[in-house]
Amino acid sequence: MNTNAPNLDRIAACKQGWNDSPFLKAQGLEVEETAVGRAVVRLPKALPTQRGGGGSDTVLNGGVISYMFDGALGWAIISSLLAMPEASDIDPFELRQFTINLDITFLNAAVGDSFEARGKVVRISRTTAFAEGEFLDANGTVCATAKGIWRVFWPRSIASTPR
């Protein structure tokens, strides 16, 4: 993978675009620490509407954990794709990926106010990506793990280019 400065600038710009999305803002989520093939999605302060996991007002709902994983692993994939040489001439917002499968194992109750989902790419090609991650509470306790598969869609001009 090409990890030169221009690609890192493009990754940073795309990250800002994700942080400006209405969905992430409404949920109080932020894509933070990013590197090629890695990402962290943080929930600095859980909202009352995000609680209720296991029937308790103190536990984060599993749905919140799921969409945080989807964002962290998905963003890790986007950052890897943007670092590929064939991505150097495309608009980063034209590159798409969709979740095929997201498998989550819940290990501990997610209790507290702030949480983070960490994602990293395990394997990636032009059409398919595999990623995994961990979900941690403010004390660093791993509350859940995830692994998933994503389908990658390049802009038509790139998709038709010989490999």
Where are these regions (language model features)?
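Terminal targeting signals and extreme-terminal segments of soluble enzymes
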Residues: 1-163
